[in-house]
Amino acid sequence: MKITSEEPEIHWTFLKVKDKVVLDFGCGIFYSQQATPDWFLKEGASKVIGVDLGNDKPNHFIYHQKPISSREDILDLVHEYKPDVIKCDIEGAEVYFSDITADDMKSVTQFAVEYHDNDLKLLMDKKIKDWGFENSDTHQLFDEDIDRIGVIYAWK
């Protein structure tokens, strides 16, 4: 599986985060480029919770250093923070959202997930509708030789 990175101002600009609580799975804290929590804060998010594996301990947003390897890992944070916005960019973690219910997602008004497989894209499209999101859009990332990688944006 190809691990990708992004420029937040290109890949996540569809998320309107001003005055919102953002739960950022795969926040990129260990990359040398800008981590997405910094960008969300610059865009006016009221609180950002970043989740990743890096060792840095930022003091300007809430950081959880933990792997996301199950539905429960996601739900623990969703229930604790009740985010308005969820962004997930963890290669392979898309599948853990498949068992999450509409009730679990009731606080979430915007959802963005990077997918790395066309079957997972179809699964996420279905889940987004099941969760009650009224609108969604898909954007392919990178170039045509990586056509199975993209982002699904959804909003209520």
Model feature map: region roles:
Residues 8, 34, 71-72, 95-98, ...:
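Structural motif corresponding to alpha-helix initiation and N-cap regions
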Residues 2-5, 68-72, 92:
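Conserved phosphate-coordination/catalytic loops
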Residues 27, 53, 66-69, 90, ...:
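Hydrophobic pocket-lining residues within nucleotide cofactor-binding pockets
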Residues 1-51, 54-80, 85, 117, 124-126, 131-156:
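S-adenosyl-L-methionine
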Residues 11-16, 73-81, 99-103:
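Short amphipathic alpha-helix with an adjacent loop that forms part of the alpha/beta core around
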Residues 28-35, 56, 91-97:
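Short acidic, Gly/Ser-rich segments with clustered Asp/Glu that frequently serve as metal-coordination loops
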Residues 60-62, 81-156:
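Conserved acidic-Pro-Pro-aromatic motif
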